Every structure is written in C-alpha cells, then in structure tokens.
Amino acid sequence: MHKVLIIDDEKDICFLISEILKDENYNTSIALNSDEAISKFKEIKPDLVILDVWLSNSKLDGIEILKEFKSINSNIPIIIISGHGTVDLAVKSIKNGAY
C-alpha cells in the first residue's frame, strides 16, 4: 500500500484529504507543523507528500520543508497546495522540485 504524508496546519483539510486517499486504498499520515512533518517524513518514508505552503504554527514554511525533504530524498514526489497561491510561489515551488 502506498504511503502519503499530508502536511497542513488545518486539521480539517488534512482529514478531508486523508479520507479521500484512504477510500482509494492509500495509507496516510498527517502532520500539522514543520517539526512533525520532518519527523514523520524520516520515520515513514512516504511515497508521496502533499504539502501546504503556508503553515501558521511552524518554524519553517512549506518551501523550506520542501528543500529539507529534497535534501533527505530527492526522489519522493511532493505536491504543493495553497489557498493563497501566486505565480511567484508556483515558480519557486517548481524550481525547488515540487509538482
């Protein structure tokens, strides 16, 4: 079963994405801040990461977490999500290896 790590500071968003993926037989883990995200990334070694770019309760933002993940394992696909996206953010995310 494929493992997906979902990172967002909003529990409801994490739960919604998790339930949709579980219905499709994915194994999901949730992180609500950057410390949790990095710890779970190392622990579960996900096959895919869904990462919110703006984490209000974190030391690191989504781009910084993306860079950290890519330094650990550059082969894991990372999808950046945001409710407040811009073209600059999209370009920055792609340049750092996100989808």
Regions found by a protein language model. Give the residues of each.
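His-Asp phosphorelay/catalytic-motif detector in bacterial-type signaling
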Residues: H2, K45-D47, S71-P77
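Short hydrophobic/Thr-rich beta-strand motif most characteristic of the beta2 strand and flanking loop
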Residues: N25-S34, K40
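Active-site beta3 strand of CheY-like receiver
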Residues: I44-I50, L55
